[in-house]
């Protein structure tokens, strides 16, 4: 007869914090110590004689056992992490191997002084009598008093939202349970943010509770927590923990008092401390609304609406966001938002109209002004402790008061203030989008979730949420904020054409009058035009399309470009800006004494450069179609390219086309592929040969057979032929670039592999974004070719952008683009750049003055 330990596994956290919580790692990466299972016998089949417990686990005594195992305290202790806040405080076990447990509600937080009267700090109701309430984190007994107050005030139905995204544990304090949160030693005053993909805060709280219970068993039934982290006087406090009932998780604190009140419901709705909610978080909120008939406009709905109660730590930031959302819901329920507007005499400028994103929304949405005013009204009703509009304006004012040369580190740095200003504007803008959603979906009882509705309105994702002012910006300020540089320094000549053509990467599509090149100088432009119109090529008409979204000037024979953080601008605005920059750079620098010295002897805008050559080449036409670097072209970019091609070919089928960007690679190649597809549809397709057998690593991906691509192909009529034609166009254009060794289908997987191999987090993030942008570019070319096929009968009267909205979006294309990724290569965990919101905003906000241009 032998002894063996129980086969139940015990998991022990061992120092690696969970992903996203101010550190790296995942919940799955926690080290575990488990007992070996039986090799040949099991408890179920053996004849157990008796069970003798030891200090840690029961020992089961069985017949005919060959092995013996026991667990000892020392083994468990070896896999936990010890730490202390200072040399004067005792050492103790750390939550998740890193975090200290800190009491998160203090008397100073209760600005409204409502803990004694209502049970929770900063308990309040919105102005105007709507049944929307907000509060800070109550204790268990405090929450019971909140419920009593709501009942006493006659609220028969109530929906309570805890909007905290961080894990919260409640420890016994006399006859009550009070809240504590894990905090990092470096940020003891900040909650943990961002649990990472796939981590549910409720599950995390249960895991931490089990961990603290184990710590207490190893420390004479006590665990150390902190109340005052300022000077650590009298810290830490030892809390007695004899069992798991001495610790509560958030769900227990909120749900147990509601057990006997079936008309009162509780939901965990994690909202971010900074910035706007994610679409998934707003979807979760809408799901609760769908399940609450008294909040909907139903025929048999009667009686008052339920009370909506929102709670976070202090009852200020996230609570205020929840209260504004709840107020908008009740305004729609009461019909206040649907009252007809009086005829406007003179529309007053809105407080937030100074921001470009708000002006863009007002221009785009027919009832946009009314929707913004409703959000402003809701914010004002909830502004007793926190006015979101004022926060945005104050942050913007602070940002304007900081000099660019201020220190780069710390909470007062320009970058930190800029980030807070951007987050607050983003939060305000998403409230406007949510109100727009309510206007369309509230009468339909939320037929679409918020995320699906946004995919049906992709133009809203295109609105750049930046701090750019709606007014004109002085060239001097643009130069200060941006990066003025000489193009020659960052435009590599991969095709070695400078010696012959005076310009980098000049090339032609075989057997087609389609050319691509880097940015030419005035001299190089003359050489190219002479080449195109010589006796061999004899092009009478030449359409030149500049794809640069940067302001470009030629100064003293060299081209300079100005990149600045902010959204792209329209072609006419870009050319106006170039004229202003020319005037600014043509002035002598201020403060110079003696003879006048100018920055440059000659300074020309691109329009002026091309106008000069029009005398020698009367058939020259110049277009400016700004396209974003690295990314897929916008829907309107396809419209403008196709219109330029069709207009020229209708006048002269022999017209030649030249496309140029900074290096003549990424944007130029994409536009050349668009031109090839358009030529084929207008003048006839060549015979597409047999599919080439590819015998290389990742052959499937070299052929462009990514899972998300094939998903799109399956949706499109004759999708495989459509993709095959795009591949043929890519191959045709790529024949001109053989020395560059770049191909769109290949570079997608190549960049993905580089991201996986990157050592630095910032570089990995940049490459992850690039690989998805290249993948999106490929998908968009396939969609454009499908459009050319399907709309050919009507001579493409309906623009591609309209077709995408009216046809493709309804087929679910934007929903696919909103889940872009490589599921065949990595787990299905959601990555931020998989979503349209992050990819499209990134191309509006990011500025990489030192990065080389897109190499495709």
UniProtKB/Swiss-Prot annotation:
Gene3D superfamilies with a match to the protein in the record: Protein tyrosine phosphatase superfamily
InterPro entries with a match to the protein in the record: Prot-tyrosine_phosphatase-like, PTP, Tyr_Pase_cat
Keyword tags: Cytoplasm, Lipoprotein, Myristate, Phosphoprotein
Region (Disordered): 1-29
Organism: Homo sapiens
Lipidation (N-myristoyl glycine): 2
PTM annotation (Phosphoserine): residues: 86
Family indicated by similarity: Belongs to the paladin family.
Keyword Transferase attributed: no
SMART domains referenced in this protein's UniProt entry, alphabetically: PTPc_motif (SM00404), PTPlike_phytase (SM01301)
Principal subcellular localization: cytoplasm
Signal peptide: none
Subcellular location: Cytoplasm, Cytosol
GO molecular function: protein tyrosine phosphatase activity
Domain of life: Eukaryota
Protein's UniProt name: Paladin
Biased composition regions of type Low complexity, renumbered to the chain: 1-16
One cellular component term from this protein's GO annotations in UniProt: nucleus
Tissue and organ distribution: Expressed in endothelial cells, and in certain larger vessels, in mural cells. In the brain, possibly expressed in microglia. Expressed in peripheral blood mononuclear cells (at protein level).
């Amino acid at each position: 007869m032998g002894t063996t330990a129980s086969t139940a596994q015990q998991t022990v956290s061992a120092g690696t914090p969970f992903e996203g919580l101010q550190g790296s790692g995942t919940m799955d990466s926690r080290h575990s110590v488990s007992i070996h299972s039986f090799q040949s016998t099991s408890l179920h089949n053996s004849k157990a004689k008796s069970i003798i417990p030891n200090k840690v686990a029961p020992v089961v005594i069985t017949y005919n056992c060959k092995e013996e195992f026991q667990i000892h305290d020392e083994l468990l202790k070896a896999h936990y992490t010890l730490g202390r806040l200072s040399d004067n405080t005792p050492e103790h076990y750390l939550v998740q191997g890193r975090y200290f447990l800190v009491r998160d509600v203090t008397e100073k937080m209760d600005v409204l002084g409502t803990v004694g009267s209502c049970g929770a700090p900063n308990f309040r109701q919105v102005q105007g009598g709507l049944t929307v309430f907000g509060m800070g984190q109550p204790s268990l007994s405090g929450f019971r008093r909140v419920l009593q107050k709501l009942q006493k005030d006659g609220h028969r139905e109530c929906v309570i939202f805890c909007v905290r995204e961080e894990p919260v544990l409640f420890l016994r304090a006399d006859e009550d349970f009070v809240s504590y949160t894990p905090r990092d030693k470096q940020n003891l005053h900040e909650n943990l943010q961002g649990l990472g993909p796939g981590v549910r805060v409720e599950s995390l709280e249960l895991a931490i509770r089990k961990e603290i219970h184990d710590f207490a068993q190893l420390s004479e039934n006590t665990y150390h927590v902190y109340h005052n982290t300022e000077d650590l006087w009298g810290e830490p406090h030892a809390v007695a923990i004899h069992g798991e009932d001495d610790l509560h998780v958030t769900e227990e604190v909120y749900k147990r008092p509601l057990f006997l009140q079936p008309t009162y419901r509780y939901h965990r709705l994690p909202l971010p401390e900074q910035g706007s909610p994610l679409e998934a978080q707003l979807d979760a909120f809408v799901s609760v609304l769908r399940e609450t008939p008294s909040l909907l406009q139903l025929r048999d709905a009667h009686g008052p609406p339920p009370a909506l109660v929102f709670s976070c730590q202090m009852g200020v930031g996230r609570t205020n966001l929840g209260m504004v959302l709840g107020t908008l819901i009740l305004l729609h329920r009461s019909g206040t938002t649907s009252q007809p507007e009086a005829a406007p005499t003179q529309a007053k400028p809105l407080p937030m109209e100074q921001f470009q994103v708000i002006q863009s929304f007002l221009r785009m949405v027919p009832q946009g002004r009314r929707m913004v005013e409703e959000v402003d009204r809701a914010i004002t009703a909830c502004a007793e402790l926190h006015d979101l509009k004022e926060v945005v304006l104050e942050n913007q004012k602070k940002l304007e008061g900081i000099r660019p040369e201020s220190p780069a580190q710390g909470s007062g740095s320009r970058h930190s203030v800029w980030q807070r200003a951007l987050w607050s504007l983003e939060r305000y803008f998403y409230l406007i989008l949510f109100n727009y959603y309510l206007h369309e979906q509230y009468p339909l009882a939320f037929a679409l979730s918020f995320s699906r509705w946004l995919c049906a309105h992709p133009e809203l994702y295109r609105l750049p949420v930046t701090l750019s002012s709606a007014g004109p910006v002085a060239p001097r300020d643009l130069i200060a904020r941006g990066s003025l540089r000489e193009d020659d320094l960052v435009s590599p000549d991969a095709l070695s054409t400078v010696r012959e053509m005076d310009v980098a990467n000049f090339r032609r599509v075989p057997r087609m009058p389609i050319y691509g090149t880097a940015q030419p100088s005035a001299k190089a432009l003359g050489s190219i035009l002479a080449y195109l119109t010589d006796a061999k090529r004899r092009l009478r008409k030449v359409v030149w399309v500049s794809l640069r979204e940067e302001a470009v000037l030629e100064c003293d024979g060299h081209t300079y470009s100005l990149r600045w953080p902010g959204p792209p601008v329209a072609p006419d605005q870009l050319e106006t800006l170039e004229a202003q920059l020319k005037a600014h750079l043509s002035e002598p620098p201020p403060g110079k004494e003696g003879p006048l010295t100018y920055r440059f002897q000659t300074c020309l805008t691109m329009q002026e450069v091309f106008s000069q050559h029009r005398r020698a080449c009367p058939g020259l036409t110049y277009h400016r179609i700004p396209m974003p670097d690295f990314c897929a072209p916008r829907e309107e970019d396809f419209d403008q390219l196709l219109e330029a091609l069709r207009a020229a070919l209708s006048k002269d089928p022999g017209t030649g086309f030249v496309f140029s960007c900074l290096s003549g690679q990424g944007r130029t190649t994409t536009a050349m592929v668009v031109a090839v597809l358009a030529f084929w549809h207008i003048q006839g397709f060549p015979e597409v040969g047999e599919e080439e057998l590819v015998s290389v690593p990742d052959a499937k991906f070299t052929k462009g057979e990514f899972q998300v691509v094939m998903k799109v192909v399956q949706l499109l009529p004759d999708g495989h032929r459509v993709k095959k034609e795009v591949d043929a166009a890519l191959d045709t254009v790529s024949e001109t670039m053989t020395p560059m060794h770049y191909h769109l289908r290949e570079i997608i997987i190549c960049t993905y592999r580089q991201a996986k191999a990157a050592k630095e987090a910032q570089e990995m993030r940049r490459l992850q974004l690039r690989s998805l942008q290249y993948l999106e570019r490929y998908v968009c070319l396939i969609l454009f070719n499908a459009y050319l096929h399907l709309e050919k009968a009507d001579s493409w009267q309906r623009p591609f952008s309209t077709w995408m909205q009216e046809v493709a979006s309804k087929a679910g294309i934007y929903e696919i683009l909103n889940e872009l990724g490589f599921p065949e290569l990595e787990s299905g965990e959601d990555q931020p750049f998989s979503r349209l919101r992050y990819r499209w905003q990134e191309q509006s906000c990011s500025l990489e003055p030192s990065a080389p241009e897109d190499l495709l």
